[in-house]
Amino acid sequence: MKFGWIKTTGTDSEERMDSVKDALESSIPGIIAEKDEISSVRELGNIKIVSDSLDADVVLINKGEDLEILKSAKLSGKETAVYVVINTKDDEVYATEVSKLDFVDYIVLEGSDWTIIPLENIIADLFGEEIKIVSVVTSVKDAEAAYEILEKGVDGVVLIPNDINEVKDFSKLIERMNSESVKLDYATVTKIEPVGSGDRVCIDTCSMMEMGEGMLIGSYSRGMFLVHSETVENPYVATRPFRVNAGPVHAYILCPENKTKYLSDLKAGDKVLVVNKNGETRESIIGRVKIEKRPLFLVEAEYNGENLRTILQNAETIRLVGEDGKPVSVVDLKVGTKVLIKPDENARHFGMAIKETIIEK
């Protein structure tokens, strides 16, 4: 996962605290702050503080300073970082060597001229190491380039922002860099039938979803159905664009990093994956999970000779995604209807994808 920090800017403490507020409002997870302003930052909100103080969450030293400080910080449970300004080949060598020390978590690299920062060399030299490489930049455009350099890119970026709009754009960039793309395809409905009542899970998120977005849910790991969010207007009940009526407690849901969870395991604060009709994804935080007894409906579909099944609540407001990305209510499903699924050749073990033969029926 890519991450981003903001470096506080301004000529006085008030201006620097404005930088902190901008970061908090834009969901930036960390900030490089002056050591004498750590308490002021904490008063504004919960954010990771990087500073040259043992009171910080990430203890930072500059090149040439005593590495014993980081050893002590690590022993006390802190994360650690070394800040290196790259001007010469010696700076590059130092950055590479210090990054291999087991008590250094982050190497923060700043170049006097962005175009000649030897990030490629450092990324290549540190391939396979546990260190997180962080680049300091002064624009969102340079941040994007740093995230993508040598395909792997840096792990994190420190932005020295010019204004709040740049911070917001930076936040959007981080979200986009961390978005996963999933392959969707159409399966053909072969059977629809009521199966009685069971415990159904509604997922209420902290995000507003749009038409064509939902979550991937299924009884089988090898094929999950795109269940549409409650964004469609109807005459019976108000829309709930933050909600997906997902299915019964046993079903899988696709979560970030290609992991699955049982619907029954979800709770407030967990992250789930919102997926649109094109397979583009974004993370969303669960605000509430509701489990209620409701009438259920079996949906069976065929994909490449395999039968896939899921169970959904038997209600007009529950929809899958049909042809052309249009939502189709479960009560309107017919044999032959095409619906979007995510096919998967992997089995699942504690939510992780594995290569194993598992029979699901």
Curated annotation (Swiss-Prot):
<dbReference type="GO" id="GO:0008652">
    <property type="term" value="P:amino acid biosynthetic process"/>
</dbReference>
<keyword id="KW-0057">Aromatic amino acid biosynthesis</keyword>
<keyword id="KW-0028">Amino-acid biosynthesis</keyword>
<dbReference type="GO" id="GO:0003856">
    <property type="term" value="F:3-dehydroquinate synthase activity"/>
</dbReference>
<dbReference type="GO" id="GO:0102042">
    <property type="term" value="F:dehydroquinate synthase activity"/>
</dbReference>
<comment type="function">
    <text>Catalyzes the oxidative deamination and cyclization of 2-amino-3,7-dideoxy-D-threo-hept-6-ulosonic acid (ADH) to yield 3-dehydroquinate (DHQ), which is fed into the canonical shikimic pathway of aromatic amino acid biosynthesis.</text>
</comment>
<dbReference type="Pfam" id="PF01959">
    <property type="entry name" value="DHQS"/>
</dbReference>
<dbReference type="GO" id="GO:0009073">
    <property type="term" value="P:aromatic amino acid family biosynthetic process"/>
</dbReference>
<protein>
    <recommendedName>
        <fullName>3-dehydroquinate synthase</fullName>
        <ecNumber>1.4.1.24</ecNumber>
    </recommendedName>
</protein>
<keyword id="KW-0560">Oxidoreductase</keyword>
<comment type="similarity">
    <text>Belongs to the archaeal-type DHQ synthase family.</text>
</comment>
<dbReference type="InterPro" id="IPR002812">
    <property type="entry name" value="DHQ_synth"/>
</dbReference>
<keyword id="KW-0520">NAD</keyword>
<dbReference type="GO" id="GO:0051287">
    <property type="term" value="F:NAD binding"/>
</dbReference>
